[in-house]
Amino acid sequence: MTAALVAAPAAATMASGSSGLAAARLLSRSFLLQQNGIRHCSYTASRKHLYVDKNTKVICQGFTGKQGTFHSQQALEYGTNLVGGTTPGKGGKTHLGLPVFNTVKEAKEQTGATASVIYVPPPFAAAAINEAIDAEVPLVVCITEGIPQQDMVRVKHRLLRQGKTRLIGPNCPGVINPGECKIGIMPGHIHKKGRIGIVSRSGTLTYEAVHQTTQVGLGQSLCVGIGGDPFNGTDFTDCLEIFLNDPATEGIILIGEIGGNAEENAAEFLKQHNSGPKSKPVVSFIAGLTAPPGRRMGHAGAIIAGGKGGAKEKITALQSAGVVVSMSPAQLGTTIYKEFEKRKML
């Protein structure tokens, strides 16, 4: 039983009567899809939207709120092509010199937006994601932490049955192509255009890997924070496919943690798609090696339950796929550098 299953009873009790039964059924279906690593073909096709660059047109949902304002200003200063935002009831006004719209559909039609970032409080975040799906925004990045898992089960159920919109998050730092496009809350100044693709369940450990790869002179090609919740829109395998097919990405850092089976699925994916003489070096760190079973460690998805989801099992799976696993997050940069040295890639 993984974090998803642990979340199921709690989420199901949040509703009563027929709505509770419906939510329980959705939970069961989404859990099985996630457990078996299944992605509907249509949703898998949306992986291509994960790659952002200077041409990505971004809107912000929750644009005029405190968080939306602060991080939109940061994005503009970084050079992100932010083209507007939405706040219901404030359409027609301007904010930070950009137009405000009442709906995502209107914002997309008027600006040609290809991505949306969500800074909306937890009770309303799922509705914001659904609004972006309705508007067929290609990439949606939800930063919000604390969204009820029952809400996210419904969102995930819907996501897997369409192929127009790709979701990153929730409860994540976002995505960044250094020097080109920053969507989220990550500190832009530590990033440097380079050769390493980084994908992580942990926001702060992402920044650690970024800083280290910058320090050793390798830099980053694309960094994706997939978030630490049990029901998210993008997992390791989605990002790994992008990294393996991206000529600018020459090495990969994967940062996982206890709970769920995303790391094990990533290991299987790497066995199938990253072997042979042209394979790319992959370095990993798994947080929670000393975590006690049954206790949630920070993220909603970071819990060892039913004897599964432990760090040791994840490390073994990754090593069997040829991944070099660092025992310390402080050594990610030097470890990937040494792998480049071994392969004469410097």
From Swiss-Prot:
Which tissues show it?
Isoform I is expressed in all tissues examined: liver, brain, heart, and skeletal muscle. Isoform II is expressed only in heart and skeletal muscle.
Which keywords accompany this UniProt record?
Acetylation, Ligase, Mitochondrion, Nucleotide-binding, Transit peptide, Tricarboxylic acid cycle
User: Which SMART domains does the UniProt entry name for this protein?
Assistant: CoA_binding
Query: Which transformation does this protein catalyse, written as a reaction?
Result: succinate + ATP + CoA = succinyl-CoA + ADP + phosphate; GTP + succinate + CoA = succinyl-CoA + GDP + phosphate
| Amino-acid positions noted as binding CoA in the UniProt annotation, renumbered to this chain | 64-67, 90, 143-145
Similarity section? Belongs to the succinate/malate CoA ligase alpha subunit family.
For this entry, the protein name equals: Succinate--CoA ligase [ADP/GDP-forming] subunit alpha, mitochondrial
Q: Which organism is it from?
A: Sus scrofa
Gene name linked to the record: SUCLG1
